[in-house]
A protein has these predicted regions:
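A short beta-sheet element
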Residues: 45-46, 56, 62-123, 139
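Amphipathic alpha-helical segments with low aromatic content
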Residues: 1-14, 142-147, 151-180
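Non-catalytic DNA-recognition/assembly elements of restriction-modification systems
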Residues: 3-28, 51
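Structural detector for helix-capping/boundary residues
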Residues: 4, 16-19, 47, 101, ...
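A short glycine-rich beta-alpha junction/loop motif
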Residues: 32, 81, 97-104, 132-154
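DNA target-recognition patches
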Residues: 19-22, 32-63, 73
Length: 180
């Protein structure tokens, strides 16, 4: 149970591993020869997820892969597993494709944990503690074995809402500072 808590909630938080509740999935590999830099469906890589894409795939390839292979549902949490590890983005449901094992998503049925709460939980993990090597990578088993605690859904919603408001406020303040 956290030290700071909304007064209307009580009781213990449940403890588990992320893999007890969710699965870790990724898109089918896209070859460089299947991309272009001008038009089509955005193809996000670890350096572009959450911002502007610099590569695209054909609509036909996208439609084919979306039907045949794993593809995220709107609201699911995506996470970068190489390069800048641990960057989390909530999938907005727009047509896009993602770089295979470098970007994975948490296939979360939301029965026990909301995607909003999961986003904030995963965003706060210090992924540098995973490896003793210089090059850090998050493996699927690292995510599945991640120990976590979570409250009832009502409390998750309230926590997620508050943290989202704080994130928005911080982003606004950072923008103001940048514009000075």
């Amino acid at each position: 149970v956290p030290h700071l808590r909304f007064p209307e909630f009580s009781g213990e938080w449940k403890k588990c591993k992320l893999g007890d509740l969710c699965n870790v999935l990724m898109c089918k590999r896209i070859l460089v020869s299947q991309t272009n830099t001008e038009d089509g469906v955005p193809f996000y890589k670890i350096g572009t997820i959450g911002s502007t894409p610099d590569a695209y795939i054909s609509k036909e390839l996208f439609d084919d892969y979306k039907v045949k292979y794993n593809y995220p549902r709107k609201g699911e949490v995506m996470i970068t597993c190489a390069g800048t590890v641990g960057k989390c983005v909530v999938y907005d449901g727009e047509d896009a494709y993602f770089q295979d094992s470098n970007i994975v998503w948490i296939d979360n049925p939301t029965q026990y944990i909301s995607n909003g709460f999961l986003f904030h939980l995963l965003s706060k993990v210090d992924w540098r503690k995973l490896n003793s090597t210089t090059i850090i990578r998050i493996y699927n088993d690292d995510l599945r074995n991640l120990k976590m605690s979570y409250p009832r859904k009502e409390e998750q919603q309230k926590i997620s809402h508050l943290l989202s408001l704080l994130d928005e406020r911080i982003a606004t303040q950072n923008k103001i500072i940048e514009d000075l």
